[in-house]
Amino acid sequence: MDIHTLRSRWAYNVQLLKQLQWACTDTAKRSLNGTISNIEASSFANNLQKCTEALQFCIQKSLTIERTLKNYEIDVPLPVIKDVLLEQELMKYYTVILMEGCKLIFDYSISIFRIGTEPRFMLCLIKLYLNLDSITELLGNEGNQFSDLLNSFEYQFMTQYNIINCNTIHLDQVRDIFAKSNPLIAPPLLTVNDIEKRGYFFLSSVDLHIDNKLIEIAQLKNGHLAVFYVNSQRQSFSTNGAKQLLKELVEGRMELLNMGRTLLFQTLKQRDMVIFLEFEDSLELVTNNSLTKKLLIQCVDKVSWCTYWKIYLENLFSEEQARTNVKASTSMLNPSHSFQNFKIKHTKLSELRPVSHQGIALNIPQKKSQNCQANITKSDDLEEDPGFKFAIHQSNPINEIYTSQTEELITSPSLNEIEYLSYDKLIALDRSLELTLSPKLLESPREANYKTVSQTFSLDRINNISQNTPEVSDQESIVSNDELEKEPVFNPSVEDHKPQLLRKKSSLLSIFSNKNKSKNKNNLKLEINSQMSSSNLSLNSASSSRTFFSVNSNDSTSTTVSDKYIEDSDRFQLDNTTSILQLKVTKASCWDKSSWQVLSSFPLLLSLVKDHEAVYLTLQNPSNSGRFKFVTRISNIWKTTRSTAKDIQISIPTKDILATILDDLTNTTPRYQVLSLRTEEAERLKNTIDHCINGDMLSSISNSTTTRTLSSDASSSYMSQVSSNVSRSSTEVSDLNVHDFKSMASVKNILVLSDIKARLHTKNNGRWCPHHIGLVNIYSLETPNNKKGIRFELTTDTRTTFQFNSKIHDLKRLGRTGIAMIDDSEYLFEFPNNVITEQIYRYIAPSHPMI
């Protein structure tokens, strides 16, 4: 054993342990400053604490071993190796460092240990593994304990890497392959659980600018096909390839950390594409439209290609309706496959068909054409179809003599006969029942039977509000002082009038309006005569602040919601939350037993926010974000439907509703409640809520990564003042090289956002050209009385720093993911996705429109 080599390796081992300790300490400090939003997760914090304590012990123990090795000049005795180098407690803490460090690197919720151009923690951990491996070789047979530990680490690292790499799906780059310019589109709701079978292929396409890239084709459970781009451009490593992976990472192959798959375009179903050319180990597909974009798919594994994938692709995209030469077995096509399901069902139905008949054996009643005449003179027509034994009714009244003659022939059909009637016969049946069975049918209509827009009704039968009639300002009001007719049938009288259209805002609430007072849309109130008895109109004291104004009468059916807010709204002020979506809802209502209850008379601000525990939906006053109308937690059992073009309805479990101004929603027994939302961005809202339900949300900036909060006051400056409990870094800047900033004596440089991944572009001959990728810090350039500009500070992977200053009015939103500085020299920062870009833009320039 070379004692000098052992000393140098052990000294290097101590150095690596100190670097790991520094990385853990730095991460803990950044978590306290709010840089890592998910650090509060108990599992992550526990793993970090274990790793830090183990590193502290191993550093102290390794320093002692290093001093012990200096006492030997030629060789180390075997007892010293067993008692010092292979001490049981030391091996235990090395196991904690390697295993807990592996968990930190591949944690689903935290990516700080595996992202970046040089992930320090991961590289130091791998170097520690390689150094221990070299020490094990020096120890020979005595180092078996180290060998077992290193083998366990290799297996753990390889397993976690493959799990993350194969089960992470990115849906932020889905393009429309059937469009000319291949624009970005909304991704389908796709998870790993929807994949039935997957395999590696090479994809080439001139139209999509793809040249022999490694992809993964997945057969979904619904029979569709999904094409994923392999981000690392490497197939999954086997267990024996763990050492190769670790060595490549140490050598700088950081593209291996770009894990996961990215969906290239929408899922393909039958006949979306057609086989253009067929080769031994590949197929060339072409889109089934006028653009005819071509995709060349080449296999990686010829065995699976010949036995499965070639047959699957031919059945999905072949122009032939049936293939007789190649037949897929049941084991090769999943029973959930749409083609196989149809074949099985069609075979069962074909067995029921008689030999002398064609088609599917379904008993469908035949419709016989009949001529509808004004007067029916023959009763033989009624006997042509036994299921149609009634006369056809027209609007002209039928003579009583004829009715008495045919009454014996008219019989009510049974329920079984009604099920097989055609549409025309059902209409005729409905008319005949109205003619013969209605007890209040009038022989000839009167003028009073026709309802018109300006018709007046009487409400004298409502005793407790008939004493004092409110003043009415609406000329189209439905209130009238006419006495009711004494007949039991409600046949209101009508005055001579000119018909006119009903105004959009007319409603039953107009009877409470005041002619002499202007309408206030933001604070609707019920104007009631002061002489009215207090027993007729009262507040429900048991409902506290979440109550309605209601008329205490059994005959009254009108109920309106006053502009109330949740009393204890302060408990919903979540500081460490991330904003997912904010938009205006013009109308929000909840179903209350038998009617819709409107939550507010003015538009509300809908917000989707998340923290480390859950995602929340809130409805609040847009001018005061602290006043809530509705707060609920989003769970995976929510259901959303699109009722109209601008309306969506959400089925919410009662247990998920945290607070609302409607008492009946939280105190009733139904398990589900229905919330209806009307907005101009209904499609965007439904898609975002569906992603929240399924847990598929784009990454965004949490509030903890910023030093400011977004102001809700539209009249305020482009950023609100920093709250007293938030700390921010500030440095004095005396000379700024941007426009008129030079003339300012004192400009403060205030950090707003930090460490945001971005790509810098510059404009060259009218085109944006990418230059650098790195992390951006955004600063606010402020004077004591005003905000003047924004500074972008970009730090690249080569540790080079660039600074760009811009006036506020020169910042423009460009496209989905860009923010441009349009001044003398134009620059563009491109951010990871639309959500992050929108949040950054609203922090630094919320008052400017998008371009």
UniProtKB/Swiss-Prot annotation:
What family does the entry list?
Belongs to the UPF0508 family.
Task: Supply the name of the protein.
Answer: UPF0508 protein CAGL0M08074g
State the organism of origin.
Candida glabrata (strain ATCC 2001 / BCRC 20586 / JCM 3761 / NBRC 0622 / NRRL Y-65 / CBS 138) (Yeast)
